[in-house]
Amino acid sequence: MIGNLNIANSNRKDTNIKFTKDQEIAVHELIEFLAQPWDDKKYINALCGAGGTGKTFVIKYVINNCKWSGGVIGCAAPTHKACRVLSNSIGGKEVNTIQSLFGFRLDVNIENFDPENPAFNPVGKDKLDGLKVLIIDEASMLNAKLVKYISNKCKKLQIKVIMLGDSSQLPPVNEKTSQAFLIASNTYYLKEVVRQGDNNPISKLLKLLREDIDNKNGWRFLDYISKNRQDYNE
């Protein structure tokens, strides 16, 4: 169990916030990651978890308490809706679409992006100047070629990257898994759902479903449903 967070920034805010064990580990390690000198082999970390485990709660704390000021921390997401949700969750900080941040023009289909085969010269002026940290939400939506492009671009500019998302969500089109989490040198998992009460039957159901997906076995989920039908009847 981690005690007080002893990190590079001694002027931490929100010192009375309580974290789950997984959240505390993620907060400590991500702030430490951002405090470390640049490393060409360790510049991408990831934070994974289902909805309600507190990914944006954790990342808001990291933004407010890491060594970098908000002006050099960029945030992005694949869709405008995801941008709005993330912005609202982290106190109104600006969040750009990946297309806008990296200078991809409107003719780019984000799901089938291929920088080696660009249609109509899609790469324009990016908005990465001065950034030291880039946080990307809904990273499971990014296909392998887009992840590679982002990785290479950020490596060239020495921008550290934190990928956020749910590794159990549907992968990008024609891919079995999202490379966004595989490319990370360290990945931190949030497993405890805190948005719903412990006695909520839906919470239990979702937990079993995720475990069956991870284990490639659907029997526990189905068995639980058959034995607890009354909990889900109207």
Q: Residues of each region from the PLM?
A:
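Short, conserved "post-DEAD/DEAH" coupling segment immediately C-terminal to helicase motif II
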Residues: 144-159, 177-179
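Inter-Walker segment of RecA-like/P-loop motor cores
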Residues: 74-130
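Hydrophobic positions on the alpha1 helix immediately C-terminal to the Walker A/P-loop
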Residues: 58, 62
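Conserved lysine of the Walker
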Residues: 55
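Conserved helicase motor core of P-loop NTPases
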Residues: 3-5, 11, 26-33, 38-45, ...
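Loop/turn-to-beta-strand initiation segments
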Residues: 72, 130-133, 157-162
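Walker B catalytic acidic pair
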Residues: 137-138, 165-167
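The conserved Walker
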Residues: 51
